[in-house]
Amino acid sequence: MSEKHYVVSLHKGFNKDEIINDLNRDTTLDSKVDSNIIPDRKVDNVNTRPSSKRMFEIALTDEEAIKLQNDPRVGGIEVPEVWSDDWLDYEQGADWTREVAVDDLTRGNWGLLRQISKTNAWGLNTTNDLSAGTTYDYHLDGTGVDYIHQEGSKFRYTHEQWQDRNGVSRLVPFQWNTLPNCGAIPTIDYTNVTGAGGHATHCCGTAVGKDYGWAKNSAIYNIPYLSLDQAFWFDAIKEFHRAKAVDPVTGFKRPTVVSASWGKKANFTSITDIQFRGASVGSVKSADFGMIGDTNGRFNAATFGLQAEVEEMQDEGVHYFKSAGNQKQKLCYSGDIDYDNHIIRSVATGSITAGDPVYYNRGAGNIGPDTVVVGNLDSMLYNNIEATNEGSDKGPRVDVWAAGTDIVSAHSTDDTAIYQRDGTSMSTPQVAGMSCLLLQLNPGWTPAQLRKWWHDNSI
């Protein structure tokens, strides 16, 4: 009998202990347990995930996993995800030039001025600086809010952008293995910059950097995933937020804001069947079926497990911001005519087994009901009006659009380095950083309330 390590995700509202108890005992003679669903043997736990109400990890054969999927309590059964940098979504007084033909690092983050104005201050002159003396003026700076950058790589811990106005670093050298149920997380050396990622550093700089970011006084945290099991990707953040005491001044816990400029990817290759709007339409990729993808033929692939992880984390009160993706796909809600569009592949797609549906209009799996999904507002104009970037995912599940093209922010090569990048990865920390300012004023807001604010106040 060949067993594999599987992650089981339950639908919301079911008792995890009950199903684990059924699996951990031999139920051969128990007539109340369906042997066509629960194996007639004692199943071994791999990780009971005590920090989670809906997730646990067990050892099953492939056949047993298929049968267990028929349990009405079970939403998904997948092999554990392994982080891949392929999932990344990127392709003050300053020069505020918005659109540039070549990289220009003398500029500021043009999103700082675009996102505080109802209109396009550049007019048709997006390749020019704004008038002399134009500044980004602010009084909110994210004080009292904890910002977490969530990604595989760490950002450069010693970069000057993490300093406050007095030159003191706001980076909290937090050891995640001090949290309950997180003892297996490796200790982080916050003096070691080896392996720091440019993408992570740039994104963090846009959210909380002292020059390029919004939340210039938020506390800054990092949880790099390259060396972590999937079990800790969200459980550690849940435990972090649970452990907070109520602030006697505000009457609430310090808000936790997480920015995630990544998403699980799949390829429009090795296709054996395409299901489009309820019908099989062959096995050849076509834009007629909403199959576009990026230049490498990739799209964001949904999994129930990652969705459940995010939803459970947000149920704890954590605010989560997710990049829409740069794969030119439509993202939609359940009930949309394209929500169930999927392909069947002859090979596995990471945690998705060969032969199982790979949905291509749901976005990446790490999107919960209260997640704010951010698209890329282009720096250039189309027919003299502002528009989304051509590569950005679009559709009704994109909540808000923010500056994401020609964005200057921090780089990982040294402590003062900056560079320019494009993508929904760059848009997302704009909104996460602005949300730190909103939560500074409204620390008791739930994730649903904050997302509603964006819906009500975006234009």
Regions found by a protein language model. Name each.
Residues 2-11:
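Short glycine-/aliphatic-rich beta-strand segments at the starts of folded cytosolic domains
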